[in-house]
Amino acid sequence: MKNHFITAFALATTLLAANAFAATPAAVSDPGRPAADTARDATRKPAEMLNFSGMKAGDNVLEILPGGGYFTRIFSKQIGPTGHLYAAIPDPKGPDAEPAAAAIAAEPGYGNITVVPILPMGAMPLLDIIWTSWNYHDLHLSRVHVDMLAVDKGWYSILKPDGVVVIVDHAALPGSPPVETADKLHRIDPAVVKTEMTAAGFVFDGESDVLANPADPHTAIVFDPSIRGKTDQFAYRFRKPK
């Protein structure tokens, strides 16, 4: 009986491991990803984030402020040659330039990426997904000074009915003023995001806690060595009604 139990347990463990491996999107397990990117997978949870977004082959996706291109490569492979990824970046000659997306788009195998200016973005087909990670708070910086209702309504206008916006960001304490908190800590109160997005017409459609860290005191700037890479983060999904 004991041997049968051990055999059954080993078989079940093997099957679970196989299922877990199979559940990892090919875009994440792609051997062509840089080692510097895969080293961040443990904290950025790309497989879980892809599943949360619902991104699939053939989708038209807008990635707002792609930074170093960590998700840019993954998204490009996830949507495949029948999809298209638009990477919206700041002025390449400005202080906030993000050259990584253009460099990736020039590499073989990433021909489905088009780099566009964040303002104005120009013409593009209606989108299935808009994604921004660790950047929504930046739109509240006092030096940026944008009308968030206009921004969010702009996203609404370029999204297909039933399309989604995924926002991942560093959480601030409840009630934190958005501009001051963005300036000092580069964080945002998740409730502010919900309020702004629903005011633009979106419906809150779900959240993921895979990036949460309740041990984060929420009082240090995200670049502080004591918390960098370990901040409490929220992932929200908003849907445009059909």
Language-model features: where?
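Conserved class I S-adenosyl-L-methionine
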Residues: 57-67
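Class I SAM-dependent methyltransferase Rossmann-like catalytic core
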Residues: 24-52, 56
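Core SAM-dependent methyltransferase catalytic element
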Residues: 215-242
